[in-house]
Amino acid sequence: MEGGGGAPAADAVMEDAAPQQQEPQQQAAMGIENIPATLSHGGRFIQYNIFGNIFEVTAKYRPPIMPIGKGAYGIVCSAHNSETNEHVAVKKIANAFDNKIDAKRTLREIKLVRHMDHENVVAIRDIVPPPQREVFNDVYIAYELMDTDLHQIIRSNQALSEEHCQYFLYQILRGLKYIHSANVLHRDLKPSNLLLNANCDLKICDFGLARVTSETDFMTEYVVTRWYRAPELLLNSSDYTAAIDVWSVGCIFMELMDRKPLFPGRDHVHQLRLLMELIGTPSEADLGFLNENAKRYIRQLPLYRRQSFQEKFPHVHPEAIDLVEKMLTFDPRQRITVENALAHPYLTSLHDISDEPVCTTPFSFDFEQHALTEEQMKELIYREALAFNPEYQQ
């Protein structure tokens, strides 16, 4: 896939697109060499002071280090691994064990991403071991470094050709085919979870919400971003399938083509209304998968007539419209599968079944079946760090 296989020319694509690191980079660029760095723990570790945040990694991550992003979980820096000569994105998850839900999310992300091995799924390059096993509160995960994400591209005034959008869609589906074949649902696909580099390679990231495909408990922990949420999730269906990710892909692709969110709902009720205004009120036959409460709720809503996608989005290729309509189907049982989406005429120029691998061993969520304490989760993450750094065994 390395930018070949029908990839559009990428030279100018990322030029204007504000990359993930744009803002912090500008703040830091002035004194990038001046980010204070101190060797610690007998020179085995190095501490950086990033805007008042202590960032402590193994000494192989030499200066300079660059802040590239910030989130609720903590801070992300690009760093250079002097042993592998690779630039990576190191995410610090501060106070990772303060509550069980966050700790489990971090453990899930690590185990899942380490299990995956695919060009369109971001890879973990390292988990930094803690300097002291007994005081282990922050987790540092090093991922392969990408240039930007789809959210930044959509927000920028970077011109995107039809070929670019098509190639991004193809890569999302190619990665999703692999993820689903591992018996995993991503459950939180959105533009900011799709990373890109200057070569137009796309990688899916953030598996903290992922679930096994056969699991039926409703999402109790975190709220998936509403705008990309399938109707069955909005209606609290506990019996959701891989089709939830396909719905999200349809929303993302139309946002890419239209440069604005397809269904920017303000709340649950508004979200459902927006999608029905476009795809129409579902028929009785389409309600079969819902529980009685959800059916009753739908029946009392105003009747919406389905709009013509072709008329609403005249600038979008008719074959792309056909594929999106099959993705944005209300009834998940009728929604197109990832395999069939890859084989759709719109993607003929890119589709190559011999180059769309599946995962040979399904992922096991067994570690979630036990009520693990924070200490047990800490121990499991510590072991994951040692798998990358056996010499740090304490």
Curated annotation (Swiss-Prot):
Modified sites of kind Phosphothreonine: 220
Domain Protein kinase: 62-347
InterPro entries in UniProt: Kinase-like_dom_sf (IPR011009), MAP_kinase (IPR050117), MAP_kinase_CS (IPR003527), Prot_kinase_dom (IPR000719), Protein_kinase_ATP_BS (IPR017441), Ser/Thr_kinase_AS (IPR008271)
Main enzyme class: transferase
Any GO molecular function: MAP kinase activity
Keywords noted in UniProt: ATP-binding, Cell cycle, Kinase, Nucleotide-binding, Phosphoprotein, Serine/threonine-protein kinase, Transferase
Location of the motif TXY: 220-222
Residues the record marks as active site: 188 (proton acceptor)
Modified residues (Phosphotyrosine): 222
UniProt binding sites for ATP: 68-76, 91
Tissues expressing this chain: Leaves, roots, root apices, and dormant and growing axillary buds.
Entry keyword NAD: no
Reactions mediated catalytically: L-seryl-[protein] + ATP = O-phospho-L-seryl-[protein] + ADP + H(+); L-threonyl-[protein] + ATP = O-phospho-L-threonyl-[protein] + ADP + H(+)
Record note on modification: Dually phosphorylated on Thr-220 and Tyr-222, which activates the enzyme.
Keyword Metal-binding: no
Activity regulation summary: Activated by tyrosine and threonine phosphorylation.
Cofactor names: Mg(2+)
EC number: 2.7.11.24
SUPFAM superfamilies assigned: Protein kinase-like (PK-like)
Similarity field: Belongs to the protein kinase superfamily. CMGC Ser/Thr protein kinase family. MAP kinase subfamily.
Entry comment, domain topic: The TXY motif contains the threonine and tyrosine residues whose phosphorylation activates the MAP kinases.
Protein name as it appears in the record: Mitogen-activated protein kinase homolog D5
Source species of the chain: Pisum sativum
